[in-house]
């Protein structure tokens, strides 16, 4: 069995028969769904190689409270994969409920790797900009996926803040350049606990950026989108773009 030989399953109870999905889904990044999910996987997913260093598997793992987004991913790729749920103890001893989906596919995984979702990508992942062909709309669908994974949209003491936590310098540079190019905004960069924190917090800039992030959006993490809508509703006219 290919999965067992390459240590991609731990025991028989994890094995699922008659799996169906669109293995060619990521062959080209030419619409909202593909761009969004690529960004989301870059943030909250990972790829693995088999024992022969061939692309073998991709997974997405998130908090159980956001299980809706995994069901949306399954719908996009026409998948019948099981979403698995488990408890995990953090380094501080806190127990968190998580859910995950794993797809074993050399073809699909190799595509993700070519787009920058490389194994152990945390510090060395990159964004293959060529795949977007300078298409601004696709770029912001990708950024929305990435921010739904690793971003926050908050209002604190009257201040609006969009924040991304990024550990790869390459990914940071690409996203900063996009925000400067398409929004004419210079995001603030700080370093905290070994990671870069990119933030947009000037009120006018905040709404300019988020308006682009959610423009023509059909896929998004609803709780973050609702935060944005509540901020729009509370903002006074001069704060809006």
Predicted segments with their positions:
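Internal intein/HINT superfamily modules and their associated LAGLIDADG
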Residues: 1-241
